[in-house]
């Protein structure tokens, strides 16, 4: 380890882990074990019209309720779902899901829908403030951005535009210590 002028050990800005200590984490650093980490950035992608939004909505509802998802343990937490392709159609999905899985019982579920248009690059600070304010300081476990294309005012094929989007998503991740998931169009 480098030393300062006084001979004291200096803390490294970029510490290196030795081969011997590198191992799979034994703690519960997941939202959905074997599928989603507890924090970071994730992207759900697939062919157009293959049901990505339906599948991810089902997955995050299992997180909100703390229910196993297809045989995988979940860590219960608050879900913020930004439905940028129009809230009306998405509300129909929510109502259908409630009927199917909650048997018509309207119980409290830590799921929050945001169905306004969003330019994540320009609006991420306001989004962080509004989420924090409306959740009373509670932190979401996951923020879903559906779709990446709708959240990006720019070209997803330009590295400069994508770098700005990732920086904005990272700000959400850091602010809440959560997973940010994009659904690709």
Predicted ranges, named:
Residues 162-185:
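Substrate-engagement module of ASCE P-loop NTPases
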Residues 51:
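Conserved glycine(s) of the Walker
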Residues 55, 59:
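Hydrophobic positions on the alpha1 helix immediately C-terminal to the Walker A/P-loop
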Residues 1-10:
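Short, small/acidic-rich helices and loops at N termini and domain boundaries
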Residues 19, 26-27, 31-32, 47-48, ...:
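Conserved inter-motif catalytic segment of the P-loop NTP-binding fold
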Residues 44:
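Hydrophobic anchor at the beta1->P-loop junction of P-loop NTPases
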Residues 62-76:
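Post-Walker A helix-loop "phosphate-sensing" segment adjacent to the P-loop in P-loop NTPases
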Residues 33-39, 71-74:
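Phosphate-binding P-loop
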């Amino acid at each position: 380890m480098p030393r300062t002028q006084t001979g004291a050990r200096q803390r490294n800005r970029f510490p290196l882990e030795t081969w011997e200590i590198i191992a799979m984490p034994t703690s519960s650093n997941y939202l959905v074990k074997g599928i989603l980490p507890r924090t970071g950035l994730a992207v759900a992608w697939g062919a157009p019209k293959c049901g990505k939004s339906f599948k991810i909505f089902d997955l995050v509802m299992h997180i909100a309720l703390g229910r196993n998802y297809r045989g995988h343990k979940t860590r219960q937490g608050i879900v913020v779902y930004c439905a940028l392709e129009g809230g009306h159609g998405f509300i129909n999905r929510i109502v259908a899901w409630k009927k199917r899985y909650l048997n018509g019982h309207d119980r409290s579920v830590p799921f929050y829908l945001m169905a306004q248009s969003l330019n994540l690059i320009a609006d991420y600070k306001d989004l962080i403030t509004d989420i924090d304010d409306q959740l009373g300081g509670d932190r979401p476990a996951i923020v879903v951005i559906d779709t990446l294309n709708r959240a990006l005012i720019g070209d997803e094929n330009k590295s400069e535009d994508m770098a700005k989007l990732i920086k904005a998503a990272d700000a959400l991740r850091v602010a809440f210590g959560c997973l940010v998931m994009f659904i690709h169009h």
